[in-house]
C-alpha cells in the first residue's frame, strides 16, 4: 500500500509540474500577444481615422466619399472647373474584384448618360460601364489603361477613368451627401440579397462587403449582376 501511495504521489507531483510549466508558457504567450493585439487595434484605428479625414464614410460594407456625386450605374462624378471626372464607386469595385484590361472611350467622343462607354475585363468576364452624364470626353486616364488594377486599389483616386465636358447642367441632379450615402448603403444590402437569393452565394455578414468573383459565375449569372447594378 505504501508503494502505491508513493507512486500516486509521484504521478501527482509530475502532473503538477507539467501544469505549472504550461501555466507559465500560457502567461508568457499572453504577455507577448497582448502588445501585438494592441498594436493591431491601434493601426486599424489610425487607418480608420485617416480614411475619415480623407472624406470616406462606411455605407453598408462599402466606402462612400463625401465629396462626390453618384450615378445609378455605380460611377462617381467629381466637378473640376468646367469638366467632370468619372470613376467607379466602391460597390462597382466589389463586383469587379480585379481587372486585367480597360477599354476607355476615345478623346472627343460624344457620350450619353446611361449608355455603355467603358468595357472592363475582369475574372474571365466583361463588364460595360455606363456614362453618368452626357457630354464630350476631354481627358483619359492613361495610368488606368496601363494599370487596370488601379480600379481595385484606388477606385476613388488614381483609378479614375475619364473626364467629360457636360452638355448641360443635368449632372447637378445626381445624388450627393447623405442622400447618396443612404442610397449606396441600400445598394450594398440589395447586392447581398441578390447574391444570396438569385445566385445562391452567401456574402459575409457585417464588416466589408465581399462579392463572388466573376470567374465562379456562369455567363448568364454575370449578366444578371451587371444588368441589376451597373445598369448595362
Predicted regions and their residues:
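Contiguous, well-folded functional domains in the mature portion of proteins
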Residues: 2-232
